[in-house]
Curated annotation (Swiss-Prot):
It catalyses: 2 a quinol + O2 = 2 a quinone + 2 H2O. It comes from the Bacteria. Its main location: membrane. It is a multi-pass membrane protein. Belongs to the cytochrome c oxidase subunit 3 family. GO terms for cellular component: plasma membrane. This is Probable quinol oxidase subunit 3. Catalyzes quinol oxidation with the concomitant reduction of oxygen to water. The gene is qoxC. The chain crosses the membrane at residues 20-40, 62-82, 91-111, 133-153, 172-192. It is found in: Cell membrane. InterPro entries: Cyt_c/ubiquinol_Oxase_su3, Cyt_c_oxidase-like_su3, Cyt_c_oxidase_su3-like_sf, Cyt_c_oxidase_su3_a-hlx, QoxC, Ubiquinol_oxase_su3_dom. SUPFAM superfamilies: Cytochrome c oxidase subunit III-like. GO terms for biological process: aerobic electron transport chain; ATP synthesis coupled electron transport.
């Protein structure tokens, strides 16, 4: 890629405005997930499981697969941004496509997990804990799906227009968003699955 007006540069005025808007958005996201976590942990401590113990329902091998898929996707996303900074478009796209595929694996297993719980009679309607459980995980899953769609749109832009100073900052921003979702999942894994099994065990 030539070093002219198409050079990757995240310091454009538009890029700076996009970053500012993203940090404002991320602050709102922290507040959203913080509220959902606080609600779930309060209900978790109260033991309102409606007779459905998490130790009987949670499948740790499945949760570990989901966790590894999302954590590895964070790594592949980081590699993609590394190659973006090196202006190596094909390698950037390869690693970002891997990120999307791993994200789809995560979402697929989460849908399977929800379907399994519903088949066992566990729905948001049976109790306040399970309602908060489905809302928290469903919100995170929806955000992951949004991130996947966002990445795909940017990859289409890069494929059609090339990597340039306008889409490069957007790729960097979506990578931050993806890492944020990974951090949220680590908290979910710890608070919902690990601590949850202790409280209901």
């Amino acid at each position: 890629m030539s070093h002219d007006t198409n050079t990757v540069d995240s310091r454009t005025h538009e890029g700076q405005l996009n970053k500012l808007g993203f940090w404002i958005f991320l602050t709102a996201e922290f507040s959203l997930f913080g509220t959902l976590f606080a609600t779930l942990l309060t209900l978790q401590h109260g033991g309102d499981y409606a007779g459905k113990m998490t130790t009987e329902l949670f499948e740790l091998p499945l949760v570990l697969i989901m966790t590894f898929a999302l954590l590895i996707s964070s790594y592949t996303c980081g590699i993609s941004i590394y190659y973006m900074r090196k202006e190596k478009q094909n390698l950037m796209m390869f690693w970002m496509i891997l990120t999307v595929l791993l994200g789809l694996v995560f979402v697929g297993f989460e849908i399977y997990e929800f379907a399994h719980y519903v088949s066992e009679g566990v729905t948001p309607q049976i109790g306040s804990y399970w309602s908060s459980f489905f809302i928290l995980l469903g919100t995170h899953g929806a955000h992951v799906s949004l991130g996947i769609g966002w990445i795909i749109c940017l990859l289409i832009q890069v494929a059609t227009r090339g990597l340039n100073k306008y889409n490069a900052p957007k790729l960097f921003i979506v990578s931050l968003y993806w890492h944020f979702l990974d951090v949220v999942w680590i908290f979910i894994f710890t608070a919902v699955y690990m601590i949850g099994m202790v409280y209901s065990g």
